[in-house]
């Protein structure tokens, strides 16, 4: 009896890739919850949130229980960050993206992003305190090595198979920054626990995130869900469908006369 969730960000209208993710979640859960991941105030808009509800209703996908809106739970994420800080598991990082990219021979993580070299992890505590007091812009990063010592060896469950965890492959992941009070990694993992999600379904592009999320679950004492990742829908050039690249929206398909059944078939 699995509880799944569909968790889009209201940063644009849904496209066929979202339809696949939603149908996959509903198909594999006896209960499927809806969560709006709207922690990026610069990109998320109420009109897009309303559009998500409209598209799901058109596809006859009715979520179980109330919709969880992440921007309404910022205090919960702050409490998690404070708890991690008290245990010495997060630290302020003052490096810019340009600093990280410019690091000599900077390797890349599973998500393709340059790995953080750890410069601020070992910063002199007095200098760190001075920069914080001055109000210097910074992010909060998870000290992955310290968290792994606390958690010990970990595995996660993917389609019934145990997979060894390698969260160190991500480097010290950002858990919060000034323009985002908490990161996707922290919010999604926290909310899956709070909402009682037992099966996390999502696209192949997020498979590697399970390693980091399992570490967060272990250090926070959150339940461990099962994971199941689905293939991505690709465009004619072999790239995954995305809002940024102007993928055709479900609203546009509806206005062009496609039926829900036709969209469902295309999304499979």
Regions found by a protein language model. Name each.
Residues 1-7, 33-34, 64-68, 72-75, ...:
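Basic, alpha-helical terminal appendages of large translation-related enzymes
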Residues 1-110, 204-205, 209-222:
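N-terminal Rossmann-like or analogous alpha/beta NTP/dinucleotide-binding catalytic cores
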Residues 99-242, 249-254:
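Active-site cores that bind ATP or allylic diphosphates and position pyrophosphate for catalysis
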């Amino acid at each position: 009896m699995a509880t799944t969730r569909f968790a889009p960000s209201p940063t644009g209208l849904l496209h066929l890739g979202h339809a696949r993710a939603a149908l996959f979640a509903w198909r594999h859960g006896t209960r499927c919850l809806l969560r709006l991941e709207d922690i990026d105030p610069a990109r998320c808009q109420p009109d897009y949130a309303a559009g998500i509800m409209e598209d799901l209703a058109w596809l006859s996908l009715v979520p179980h229980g109330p919709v969880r809106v992440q921007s309404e739970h910022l205090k919960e994420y702050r409490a998690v960050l404070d708890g991690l800080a008290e245990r010495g598991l997060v630290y302020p990082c003052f490096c810019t993206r340009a600093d990280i990219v410019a690091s000599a021979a900077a390797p890349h993580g599973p998500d393709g992003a340059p790995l953080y070299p750890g410069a601020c992890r070992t910063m002199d505590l007095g200098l760190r305190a001075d920069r914080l007091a001055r109000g210097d812009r910074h992010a909060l990063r998870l000290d992955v090595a310290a968290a792994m010592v606390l958690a010990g060896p970990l595995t996660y469950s993917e389609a019934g198979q145990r997979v060894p965890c390698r969260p160190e492959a991500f480097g010290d992941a950002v858990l919060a920054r000034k323009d985002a009070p908490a990161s996707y990694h922290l919010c999604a993992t926290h909310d899956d626990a709070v909402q009682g999600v037992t099966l996390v379904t999502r696209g192949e592009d997020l498979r590697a995130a399970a390693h980091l999320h399992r570490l967060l679950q272990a250090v926070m004492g959150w339940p461990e869900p099962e994971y199941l990742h689905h293939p991505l829908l690709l465009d004619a050039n072999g790239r995954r469908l995305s809002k940024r690249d102007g993928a055709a929206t479900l609203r546009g398909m509806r206005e062009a006369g496609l039926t829900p059944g036709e969209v469902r078939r295309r999304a499979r």
